[in-house]
Swiss-Prot record:
Residues 369-379 have a biased composition (Basic and acidic residues). The gene is ZDHHC18. It catalyses: L-cysteinyl-[protein] + hexadecanoyl-CoA = S-hexadecanoyl-L-cysteinyl-[protein] + CoA. Residues 1-67, 364-388 are annotated as: Disordered. This is Palmitoyltransferase ZDHHC18.
Length: 388
């Protein structure tokens, strides 16, 4: 059946089409009252009202702007550009990261690059510019990308899960169990219940206490990038710290070379007094390069082992907590395969519809009995929110 479009026409909106020979009444002509009863008056056009949530019932002003889902997002995140970009609630440390990178590289391009390009080679500022733009690109992608947040269970899904657990059907409240077990590559993995998101967390998922979200393949919350590091932005985070270590080491070596060349034939202390900007770069790079190199090496080990920081700290697949060491079910037993799986796999789509509109409350067509549930819930697989 083809789709048809319907249009509501008011009974008094337009006259019926007249025959070709009929005479049209003039604009000032008025109907003459006949002997019969008067025709009924045309009904008034319907009045539409909207409530704050966008529904068709209730009081509200006409044409109120519907809210998008990022405006009512339950986590502690901040959104920009109409929900296209997101950041953690506390961005002070992230601003400090931007300040340190921009200040150090800015001073290097202004006070060191001209001298080194003139005395040595023009390749020095070119290499520094390439590293700088790559570092900034990876940092912004890490900070403003959804790390893999799982949407919280709706009221219907949470109620259906509690009813599924309580098989007796009694009205007494019984809290859901804290764990479930699933088999992954021959290894039993526990799924913990999140009382905030009202669902069993998928494997490798953890609830971030800072952002108040469940994040897939949760690695850690990094205040330096202002975001959680998870399944969807870990590759950008790893590329950021790795490229930042190269940029820091490159600037440190170039500044030392600059000061050494300037100090030839003169006092080294007087050279330091003449170039205070280079001294500031040297201090910043010296105190930051060790932590950046150490962090890059640690995450290289995690990538090669297909582990997360959260799993390594908790000792999930080792004997750090005094228990028996178990095999990592997510490892492919090959360093190259693990690196490709973590860094080169397809980027999964975001599961939170930030740009979508908040759906209005639907009116049920028939009354609901007290012994029936108020809504239908999705199957348990969808409530888990991810694949093993």
């Amino acid at each position: 059946m083809k789709d048809c479009e319907y249009q509501q026409i008011s009974p008094g909106a337009a006259p019926l089409p007249a025959s070709p020979g009929a005479r049209r009444p003039g604009p000032a002509a008025s109907p003459t009252p006949g002997p019969g009863p008067a025709p009924p008056a045309a009904p008034a056009p319907p009045r539409w009202s909207s409530s704050g949530s966008g529904s068709g019932s209730g009081s509200g002003s006409l044409g109120r702007r519907p809210r998008r889902k990022w405006e009512v997002f339950p986590g502690r995140n901040r959104f920009y550009c109409g929900g296209r970009l997101m950041l953690a609630g506390h961005g002070g440390v992230f601003a400090l990261t931007l300040l340190l990178i921009l200040t150090t590289t800015g001073l290097f391009f202004v006070f060191d690059c001209p001298y080194l390009a003139r005395k040595l080679t023009l390749a020095i500022p070119i290499i520094a510019a390439i590293l700088f733009f790559f570092v900034m690109s990876c940092l912004l992608q890490t900070s403003f990308t959804d790390p893999g947040i799982l949407p919280r269970a709706t009221v219907c899904e949470a109620a259906a899960l509690e009813k599924q657990i309580d098989n007796t059907g009694s009205s007494t409240y019984r809290p859901p169990p804290r764990t479930r077990e699933v088999l992954i590559n021959g290894q039993m993995v526990k799924l913990k219940y999140c009382f905030t998101c009202k669902m069993f967390r998928p494997p490798r998922t953890s609830h971030c206490s800072v952002c108040d979200n469940c994040v897939e393949r949760f690695d850690h919350h990094c205040p330096w990038v202002g975001n959680c590091v998870g399944r969807r932005n870990y590759r950008f985070f790893y590329a950021f710290i790795l490229s930042l270590s190269f940029l820091t080491a490159f600037i440190f070596a170039c500044v030392v070379t600059h000061l050494t060349l300037r100090a030839q034939g003169s006092n080294f202390l007087s050279t330091l007094k003449e170039t205070p900007a280079s001294v500031l770069e040297l201090v910043i790079c010296f105190f930051s390069i060790w932590s950046i190199l150490g962090l890059s090496g640690f995450h290289t080990y995690l990538v090669a082992s297909n582990l997360t920081t959260n799993e390594d700290i908790k000792g999930s697949w080792s004997s750090k907590r005094g228990g028996e060491a178990s095999v990592n079910p997510y490892s492919h037993k090959s360093i190259i395969t693990n690196c490709c799986a973590v860094l080169c796999g397809p980027l999964p789509p975001s599961l939170i519809d930030r740009r979508g509109f908040v759906q209005s409350d639907t009116v049920l067509p028939s009354p609901i009995r007290s012994d029936e549930p108020a809504c239908r819930a999705k199957p348990d697989a969808s409530m888990v929110g991810g694949h093993p």
